[in-house]
Amino acid sequence: MAGIKALISLSFGGAIGLMFLMLGCALPIYNQYWPLFVLFFYILSPIPYCIARRLVDDTDAMSNACKELAIFLTTGVVVSAFGLPVVFARAHLIEWGACALVLTGNTVIFATILGFFLVFGSNDDFSWQQW
């Protein structure tokens, strides 16, 4: 039952994060859809770590280096997702209020992605690797 509660909590967190992103785009005072480009970063952020977990064996000495490279690449994607709205706001493509809403949405979405890997990352019967 704890897995179902975690899944519902993660779904709620994702919905709240996407709501902040949409508010930063669709409110009549902002009315610019440039911040939707951060959706690409949401999709790209878990990919390096997922690939590293599938390819490496924990007994190998190279596995630690491969996982650290994956975490480094994931960090670059996350920092880019936080930097893009700021660059858009500095270039006057979006308003600073929209930037704040998008950054709030980024925080919630990336916390949800981290929570997913913490909840479903173990190698038990309720693991995401079975999907």
Curated annotation (Swiss-Prot):
The chain crosses the membrane at residues 7-27, 32-52, 69-89, 100-120. This is Leptin receptor overlapping transcript-like 1. It is found in: Membrane. The lineage of its organism: Eukaryota, Metazoa, Chordata, Craniata, Vertebrata. It is a multi-pass membrane protein. Belongs to the OB-RGRP/VPS55 family. Keywords: Membrane, Transmembrane, Transmembrane helix. GO terms for cellular component: endosome; membrane. The gene is Leprotl1.
